[in-house]
Amino acid sequence: MKRIISAAVTAGFSLLPGNMTAARAADITVLSSNGLKAAVVELVPQFEKETGHKLVFTWGASNLLVKQIEGGEAFDVVIVTPALIKNLVKQGKVVDGSAVDLARVGVGVAVKQGAPKPDIHTVDAFKQTLLNAKAVAYTTAGQSGQHFIGVLEKLGIAEQVKAKAKTTPGGAVAEFVAKGEADVAIQLIPELASVPGVEVVGPLPAEIQTYIVLTGGIGTNAKDKVGAQALIKYLKTPAAISVIKAKGMEPG
């Protein structure tokens, strides 16, 4: 929870037709998975300019964000995995029928900028890369982190990697690589690519890859459901889809 990053991004003019001014447009509070951060941050200024809304973000691992919601955190829009959205609907915290798939993203590998890129094209090569690394960085939270932990067990090297792991419950694990504290980092590709000083080697081999779907939903107690819906619709526009693709994701 400590590593969940909060950020507010500002700008704007007006959302609703006619004479609604920027001064009257409501803030929209968004709790979003780190996986969509690189794309959304780039899209925010234009959305705010067109609508007059200010977007106020809390970024983090999906499961940690849900814990915040279950603890009473107020929000207008939440962007996490479909299963978590479904549970929030059951709890009455997300409007039933408001869920929209926004993006699909895979897990990748990153190294420090300028460092030799290891072979990760096959499962055996990836396994050897992990064994050769002096330190491996990965997250212990979120669907991608849990998937990687499962991969380590499947490959039979969980204990070897755990002994030299650099882990965090949330945030950008590629920072360990950028600072020279780990040789490789494993996380969702957009999260890796967003860290200065690192290079994405590529995705995990197909046999052990997983794709995380990120879904947006509107809070039952959202301050401005119309504004929340406008944001979700904006993230499905051609302009937004273009940015999502450019950040290494597939549109939902």
Describe these PLM feature segments.
Residues 2-10:
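Sec-dependent signal peptide recognition
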Residues 8-9, 16, 34:
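Serine/proline-rich low-complexity intrinsically disordered segments, especially terminal tails, linkers
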Residues 23-63, 67-71, 79-92, 96, ...:
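Exported/periplasmic ABC-transporter solute-binding proteins
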Residues 75:
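Dinucleotide-binding Rossmann-like beta1-alpha1 core, especially the glycine-rich loop
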Residues 14-22:
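C-terminal segment of classical bacterial N-terminal signal peptides
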